[in-house]
Amino acid sequence: MTSSVLTPSLKLLAMTNSSSSTLFCIPSIFNISSSESHRFNFSLSSRPVNLTLSLKSKTLRNSSPVVTFVSQTSNWAEEEEGEDGSIGGTSVTVDESFESEDGVGFPEPPEEAKLFVGNLPYDVDSQALAMLFEQAGTVEISEVIYNRDTDQSRGFGFVTMSTVEEAEKAVEKFNSFEVNGRRLTVNRAAPRGSRPERQPRVYDAAFRIYVGNLPWDVDSGRLERLFSEHGKVVDARVVSDRETGRSRGFGFVQMSNENEVNVAIAALDGQNLEGRAIKVNVAEERTRR
């Protein structure tokens, strides 16, 4: 008499371990089948199962590679193992292709497409900056610079567009663009590993103006625009803290002649700027020790 016995038929179920991103298999439940003998038949191929692994990552900064797992749990145990080692002609693939260290794989955007973005509101982070510049094209890299000690934005950052044309469009669109009451300064970033040579500043003390009690969000560009209404501004600079990059609340403006200095002082000394009465007077030349 034919007896019914439990013949464990192993179905391979693809599973992933999120902590190590590995694939492994476990047996399925027992299937009832007929057999003449009272023994358990385990049918497992001794041939290795090839799992093709590949990972796809996009050239992004400050993000980890995206790992996409594709698994299939159809009746693999009922299908024959293929000649290539796959089960029933079905393979489990995890696509993994990293960019090599020398940049081969995904082309780097041109350096000319990297932009400096200054006078950022302090609550704008890298994601918000990227979303803003996407109006001009594809943003490859977006980075707001933070103070390492306070973890606060230093009020500037960098955006790399996909092409030089998109970078030029972004400069045209966003330079002097107002965000949360602040006008952005957008221009080409200096090439990697180099800095533009600064011309030595020659000040005539008679034409140099001290500006005090400035609002904290006033930068050099805004200071220049304020004084340009009263003459030709040769140079304008808000003094910043070396450690934090924040304004120290005062700066200096150099006009082109003495008459413009007098006009600017008369017009702006004591004027209200964002609720603060600014102090404007002739800068005193420091005695060098």
Curated annotation (Swiss-Prot):
Post-translational modification: ADP-ribosylated by the Pseudomonas syringae type III effector HopU1. ADP-ribosylation reduces the ability of the protein to bind RNA.
RRM domain boundaries: 113-191, 207-285
Cellular location(s): Plastid, Chloroplast
GO biological process: innate immune response; mRNA processing; RNA modification
A GO term, aspect molecular function: poly(U) RNA binding
SMART domains (UniProt xref): RRM
Cross-referenced Gene3D superfamilies: 3.30.70.330
Pfam family, one: RRM_1
Phenotype caused by lack of the gene: No visible phenotype under normal growth conditions, but mutant plants exhibit multiple specific editing defects in chloroplast transcripts.
Record keywords, A-Z: Chloroplast, mRNA processing, Plastid, Repeat, Ribonucleoprotein, RNA-binding, Transit peptide
Record keyword Chloroplast present: yes
Location, primary (coarse class): plastid
GO CC entries: chloroplast; chloroplast envelope; chloroplast stroma; plastid; ribonucleoprotein complex
Main function: Required for specific RNA editing events in chloroplasts and stabilizes specific chloroplast mRNAs.
PANTHER family reported in the protein's UniProt record: 31 KDA RIBONUCLEOPROTEIN, CHLOROPLASTIC-RELATED, OS02G0815200 PROTEIN
Protein name: RNA-binding protein CP31B, chloroplastic
Species in which this protein is naturally found: Arabidopsis thaliana
Gene name per UniProt: CP31B
